[in-house]
């Protein structure tokens, strides 16, 4: 069936972790050599040679992982070829955030690469990652446009979401961010939630009626 085994000088099948000709390999309980998969010892063995893999990105089914210089599963941020990735629970993160510190970062849903210097969409919400990948929060000016991203340190589910079609009160002043672009309303009269405002040149809303 295309399986590989190893019989020692006594005619016994080798089982478990073994070193043969200075190469670390692994055999299951029936003597079948592990290739292209993680073994019960949590190490990955090469799909062609069956040798223990170290310091490399590996794939087992749909799961992508990184193993360190000792062959152990790596967790955390890792730079590979100048591209930053993030591994959580032994797997490359794709289409999700790194919540591990006070700053928020997002990793591309297709490649797993850190998203930098652009707007991106996640679960129908828009965010912006700066040149270092940090998700922006609060009042920002991007491409000359005044925009706002929620900054809720107690609710990571909302942190960094761009305000669109929303009234936002900051330091006692009311601002409105437009539905499509998310740009701040300026020099315009609008009715929002049945209240009519005039938003001045600085975007501050004044109730008219």
Where are the model-predicted features located?
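Extracellular adhesion/carbohydrate-binding repeat motifs centered on closely spaced tryptophans
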Residues: 1-209
